[in-house]
Amino acid sequence: MGSAQSVPPEMRALAERTGFTSEQIEQLHRRFKQLNHNRKTIRKEDFDTIPDLEFNPIRARIVHAFFDKRNLRKAPAGLAEEINFEDFLTIMSYFRPIEMDMDEERLESFRKEKLKFLFHMYDADYDGIITLQEYKNVLDELMSGNPHLEKESLRAIAEGAMLEAASACMARTGPDEVYEGITFEDFLKVWKGIDIETKMHVRFLTMEAIAHCY
């Protein structure tokens, strides 16, 4: 993929587009080849070889997100059957750790990109709105990974979280309007003050998800 001293134009373009350094891109390219067994693309089943995802309660959603055309910036809806290395880098860039030298404008843009990715994980039907049922589905999946919580406790936590999310967004709803769900603008309000910048990242070599996205 090139060396740090003589960076090919292709590598430079990828670095500018994704924010990764050339060394990080080379590292991710090695991981990409491990996943696809030296093919040119990755399919969903290739993620079955990642041990750290095996017991993640939202594993299916994480894998789905890699093929979501919204996250790939290719279309407003739909799934890709396979992704190439540039697509893989695009998705991994959402998990890129915060840089200490980011100014306020870049940090805000960085935060919005991460939250847009997370929003798409909730918005399963691509309509730009997270319904309360979609919100509950994700929470149910997340909390299913805790064997110490009883079913009634899970339901109470989910309902409470949904009510909190809805109440944060319903102030702008008129008396004759029906609350349909959470838009991305609402989602930004719900997540205001939550440190998504440092929580949502992935270890490059193992692709172990560090994010606690709920």
Swiss-Prot record:
Record family assignment: Belongs to the calcineurin regulatory subunit family. CHP subfamily.
Statement: the UniProt record of this protein carries the keyword Lipoprotein: yes
BP GO annotations: cell differentiation; cellular response to retinoic acid; positive regulation of granulocyte differentiation; positive regulation of sodium:proton antiporter activity; protein localization to plasma membrane; protein maturation; protein stabilization; regulation of cell adhesion mediated by integrin
Name of the protein in its database record: Calcineurin B homologous protein 3
Gene of this entry: TESC
SUPFAM superfamilies: EF-hand (SSF47473)
Tissue: Expressed in the bipotential gonad by E4.5 and expressed in both the testis and ovary by E5.5, but with expression higher in the testis. Expressed in the testis cords but also at low levels in the interstitium. In the ovary, expression is principally in the ovarian cortex, but also in the medulla. Also expressed in the embryonic brain, with expression highest in the region between the nasal placode and olfactory bulb. Also expressed in the embryonic heart and tail.
Function text: Functions as an integral cofactor in cell pH regulation by controlling plasma membrane-type Na(+)/H(+) exchange activity. Promotes the induction of hematopoietic stem cell differentiation toward megakaryocytic lineage. Essential for the coupling of ERK cascade activation with the expression of ETS family genes in megakaryocytic differentiation. Also involved in granulocytic differentiation in a ERK-dependent manner. Inhibits the phosphatase activity of calcineurin.
Alphabetical list of InterPro entries matching this protein: CHP3, EF-hand-dom_pair, EF_hand_dom
Record Gene3D superfamilies: EF-hand (1.10.238.10)
PANTHER family: CALCINEURIN B HOMOLOGOUS PROTEIN 3 (PTHR46823)
Assembly: Monomer. Homodimer.
Keyword field: Calcium, Cell membrane, Cell projection, Cytoplasm, Differentiation, Lipoprotein, Membrane, Metal-binding, Myristate, Nucleus, Protein kinase inhibitor
Major location (coarse): nucleus
Topological relation to the membrane, as annotated: Lipid-anchor
Coiled coil: none
GO cellular component: cytoplasm; lamellipodium; nucleus; plasma membrane; ruffle; ruffle membrane
GO molecular function: calcium ion binding; magnesium ion binding; phosphatase inhibitor activity; protein homodimerization activity; protein kinase inhibitor activity
Binding-site list for Ca(2+): 123, 125, 127, 134
Lipidation residue positions, type N-myristoyl glycine: 2
Keyword Cytoplasm belongs to the record: yes
Domain EF-hand as annotated: residue spans: 110-145
Compartments in which it is found: Nucleus; Cytoplasm; Membrane; Cell membrane
Organism: Gallus gallus (Chicken)
Domain of life: Eukaryota
Domain notes: Binds calcium via its EF-hands. Calcium-binding mediates a conformational change. Can also bind magnesium.
